[in-house]
Regions:
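Terminal low-complexity/charged segments
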Residues: 1-201
């Protein structure tokens, strides 16, 4: 049970959990040790996912990650929440040396949330291009997006700031601006674009 895990890991603090998972806060400096011990001594041999979190620009600590470990023999999850000490330069230790499957999870968190995973063998963006200056899943990133210089292979205009969207594109949560469509069939629009977008007939 959770008390046995706490006694084995003196640095873990229990968290409230809405499900049956054992949930704990874990200091970043102990994350690798906790992952190794869960794998080797407690039979939590599967790292299911790593989810980056942003508590908001006014929060301190602001950034962190949630780790889910699963034991097939126990049919139980352990959830570790690890917050970054520095909100300006968020960083956590990489778990690639413990679980190879951490590779792409950490790259995604680095790409979209801007968390650096120290010790990662090849920490590169996985969705956005390398020169993209922002991290789209941060809470201060506008829902309507931001124009940014594109690599030559993507640019189709002289200043290379954006591409012309295909007819069914147009950014996140935009209604089609030209098609005739019933109100019940419209896709939702973000609050910061709805006011400026023309209404469909």
């Amino acid at each position: 049970d959770s008390s046995k895990i706490i006694s084995e890991f003196g640095f873990l603090k229990p968290r409230k959990s809405a499900d049956s998972a054992f949930a704990f806060d874990c200091p970043p400096e102990h994350l690798v040790k906790a992952a190794k011990t869960l794998r080797d001594s407690r039979d939590f041999r599967s790292l299911q996912d790593i989810a980056a979190i942003d508590m908001g620009p006014d929060s301190s600590p602001r950034f962190g990650a949630v780790y889910h470990f699963y034991s097939h023999s126990k049919k139980k999850y352990v959830r570790l929440v690890c917050m970054c000490a520095d909100s300006a330069r968020p960083a956590l230790p990489s778990l690639c040396g413990v679980f190879k499957g951490a590779d792409w999870h950490e790259r995604e968190a680095y790409d979209l949330m801007g968390i650096t995973f120290e010790g990662h063998p090849s920490l590169r963006r996985i969705m956005m291009w390398e020169s993209y200056p922002w991290h789209p899943l941060r809470k201060d990133f506008p829902l309507s997006g931001r124009d940014a210089p594109l690599p030559d292979t993507f640019a189709d205009n002289e200043d290379a700031t954006k591409v012309v969207p295909a007819p069914e594109e147009g950014g996140p949560f935009h209604s089609p601006s030209t098609a005739t469509i019933f109100a019940s069939q419209r896709e939702p629009r973000s609050a910061d674009t709805a006011a400026s977008a023309p209404e469909n007939p």
